[in-house]
């Protein structure tokens, strides 16, 4: 397991660097949401197929072939399966790409343009329009003005006066709120700030022409000055033109507003210009975000084709005990995506859209490279996979029968994240926020849970095939103990210092303090289920080794139902405060623990936990809680460094992590939760499995 964990650690570190740079380039804006939503498909299939589920069906059958009929017959079975995969996934890819628009309507329904108002034609005699815009839970409001002629010119301004809204002053008293739009010109600034003004505030008129960028930041006269009346305050929001040419109102963080009134004026820029008919539409989300998601998904969907084949090749290599190459293949994905970001920097491409497209093409290229590397490794191992017309024989039928429920069962966390993404698409910025939080959560999950699952499945399968059930149960028990020893402190630390971790990793010009807070709380929600995620990886081999994929599938279905119910409930409860996405993270954790309970009860006593193991578990939990308190205090002490330069933040994070490891190590040894000899024997046993 050490080799697998080591290579996975390298991949996770590179993935961290990749995501830190993505956060620096695009933050949590519309392009970030579009890329993350589009990337979810190939990334989900990489985790489901490449990290256990396909192996759950293929490895036991392939392993039995090796044991009973020899490697030559087993390789023949693998080649036939490979050929079937090429045909099946190839057809799926060719069908899905042109149908991506309809697929994304299911995956991210919240990205569909949400018309708040459509004023239709304006400019025929009437020069003043007013409409009420609902903004509850929104981060931005978009205005789109289109004309029937390129010569159409609109001169308009916007202001809001909301009499039934209130803002708490420093003394806690409610005061009426006057909202003003502040022109920042082009390009638009990244985030708005609450500013309570004591004096009059300038309201700027903007001029827009047929050229989507024309006039911005120039035709600002005449200006109107207004003074808040008694009992009113002023809340500024940012108003400008985004890179796609849409007028945008960026609302302050935690604005608490439910609606405001927009006043639109149509007039002449100069005496020689006539007013033409125009159409004004107002959106609660970026009207082009859905189309961008579809375009990026089409580019990256070919990654699914390569990942299905990579999963098959990984299963062959893992059964032959070549763990290193499959475990190291994801490193290529991170390297290529880092190269894509480097290309954006080198070419000095400006705009989030170019970053999103460059990353999408990088993902597609990485899938091809991973396939080539694993195909060469299989060939050198004497198992070259050459596609041919597949034979529809009983072995292939059995594999397909086992693979379906196995994919669902082993991919339960990814199914949960997919469901969460559907719900999160209705909150602006939530999809990218959940992505960044999940990436941090994936570090211990990838190093511990996935590595344990990959190594345990072939080992448990071999021992059950040879009738050594007690040894198989002992392997699972040791895996559970090691999983809890490592994940309990990781979960405690991520809950205790959720915001400092995100601050140190992602904070930047396009990743605001609001983004840090929201991502941090999502990380805390995911961390509550971290031990559960890893236990699922440890317990499932007890079923898959017996070729039982039906019961785990049913259990996974129950967990998904729990996840959907909890996500809908908690999202609705927390959305008014802007934290609906945290409810999705908590629901994912709850569903993971439900799945663990069902898997444990379904084993019918196959693995028994002695009293001494329960005592060690309680000591691990106590050590984790005490360590969590220590790192929380460390985070407070290093708060200024976490807000400093990149190097200061990295040093602060290293100090926090180092303190946590040292304190926890000392506590588990002093409390008797484990011993150095026990750790050494576990690691040596895992190394023996790899060799």
PLM regions and their residue ranges:
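Extracellular carbohydrate recognition
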Residues: 150-162, 270-275
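Noncatalytic modules at the cell exterior or secretory-pathway interfaces
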Residues: 134-145, 243-248, 252-263
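Intrinsically disordered, low-complexity acidic Ser/Thr-rich regulatory segments
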Residues: 212, 221-232, 243-246, 250-256, ...
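Short strand-edge motifs at loop-to-beta-strand transitions and within beta-strands
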Residues: 127-131, 233-235, 247
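Internal, charge-rich low-complexity segments
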Residues: 105-137, 151-152, 157, 173, ...
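Membrane-embedded alpha-helical bundles of multi-pass transporters/translocases
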Residues: 1-121, 279-691
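Short beta-strand-plus-loop segments that form exposed binding edges in beta-rich domains
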Residues: 144-152, 263-269
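Disordered, acidic Ser/Thr/Pro-rich linker "stalks" and the adjacent N-terminal cap
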Residues: 118-125, 177-241, 252
């Amino acid at each position: 397991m050490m080799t697998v964990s080591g290579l996975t650690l390298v991949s996770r570190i590179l993935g961290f660097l990749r995501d830190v740079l993505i956060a620096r380039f695009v933050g949590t804006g519309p392009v970030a949401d579009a890329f993350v939503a589009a990337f979810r498909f190939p990334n989900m299939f990489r985790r489901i197929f490449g990290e256990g589920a396909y192996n759950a069906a293929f490895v036991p059958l392939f392993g039995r072939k090796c044991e009973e009929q020899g490697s030559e017959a087993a390789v023949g079975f693998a080649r036939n399966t490979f050929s079937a995969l090429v045909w099946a996934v190839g057809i799926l890819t060719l069908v899905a790409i042109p149908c991506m628009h309809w697929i994304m309507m299911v995956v991210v329904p919240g990205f569909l343009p949400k018309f708040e108002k459509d004023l239709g034609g304006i400019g025929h005699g009437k020069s003043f329009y007013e409409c009420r815009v609902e903004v509850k839970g929104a981060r931005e409001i978009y205005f789109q003005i289109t004309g029937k002629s390129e010569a159409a010119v609109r001169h308009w301004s916007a202001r809001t006066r909301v009499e039934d809204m209130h803002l708490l002053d420093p003394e806690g008293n409610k005061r009426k709120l006057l909202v003003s739009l502040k022109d920042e010109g082009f390009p638009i600034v990244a985030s708005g700030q609450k500013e309570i003004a004591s004096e009059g505030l300038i309201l700027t008129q903007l001029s827009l022409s047929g050229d989507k960028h024309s006039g911005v930041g120039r035709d600002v006269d005449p200006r109107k000055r207004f003074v808040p009346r008694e009992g009113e305050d002023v809340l500024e929001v940012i108003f400008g033109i985004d890179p796609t040419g849409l007028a945008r109102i960026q609302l302050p963080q935690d604005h608490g507003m439910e609606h405001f009134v927009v006043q639109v004026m149509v007039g002449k820029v100069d005496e020689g210009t006539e007013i033409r008919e125009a159409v004004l539409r107002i959106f609660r989300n970026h009207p082009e975000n859905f189309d961008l998601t579809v375009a990026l998904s089409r580019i990256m969907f070919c990654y699914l084709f390569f990942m299905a084949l990579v999963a098959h090749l990984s299963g062959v290599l893992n059964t032959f005990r070549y763990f290193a190459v499959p475990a190291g293949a994801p490193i290529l994905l991170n390297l290529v995506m880092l190269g894509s970001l480097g290309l954006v920097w080198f070419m000095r491409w400006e705009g989030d859209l170019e970053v999103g497209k460059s990353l999408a093409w990088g993902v597609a290229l990485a899938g091809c490279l991973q396939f080539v590397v694993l195909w060469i490794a299989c060939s050198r191992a004497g198992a070259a996979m050459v596609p041919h017309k597949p034979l529809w024989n009983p072995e292939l039928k059995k594999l397909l029968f086992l693979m379906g429920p196995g994919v669902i069962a082993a991919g339960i966390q990814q199914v949960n994240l997919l469901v969460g993404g559907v719900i999160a698409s209705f909150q602006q910025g939530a999809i990218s926020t959940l992505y960044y939080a999940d990436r941090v959560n994936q570090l211990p999950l990838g190093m511990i849970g996935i590595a344990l699952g990959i190594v345990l499945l072939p080992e448990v399968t071999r021992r059950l095939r040879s009738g050594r059930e007690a040894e198989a149960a002992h392997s699972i028990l040791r895996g559970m103990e090691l999983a809890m020893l490592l994940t309990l402190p990781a979960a405690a630390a991520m809950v205790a210092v959720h915001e400092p971790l995100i601050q140190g990793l992602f904070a930047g010009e396009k990743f605001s303090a609001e983004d840090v807070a929201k991502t941090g709380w999502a990380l805390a929600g995911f961390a509550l289920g971290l031990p559960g995620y890893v236990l699922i990886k440890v317990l499932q081999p007890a079923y898959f080794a017996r070729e039982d994929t039906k019961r785990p599938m049913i259990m996974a279905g129950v967990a998904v139902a729990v996840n959907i119910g909890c996500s809908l409930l908690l999202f609705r409860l927390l959305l008014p405060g802007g934290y609906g996405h945290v409810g999705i993270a908590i629901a994912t954790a709850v569903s993971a623990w439900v799945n663990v309970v069902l898997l444990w009860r379904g084993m019918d006593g196959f693995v028994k936990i002695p009293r001494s193991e329960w005592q060690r578990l309680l000591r691990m939990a106590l050590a984790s809680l005490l360590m969590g308190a220590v790192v929380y205090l460390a985070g407070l002490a290093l708060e200024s460094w976490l807000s400093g330069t990149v190097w200061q933040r990295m040093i602060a994070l290293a100090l926090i992590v180092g303190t946590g490891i040292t304190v926890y190590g000392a506590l588990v040894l002093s409390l008797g939760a484990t011993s150095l000899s026990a750790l050494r024997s576990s690691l040596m046993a895992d190394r023996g499995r790899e060799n």
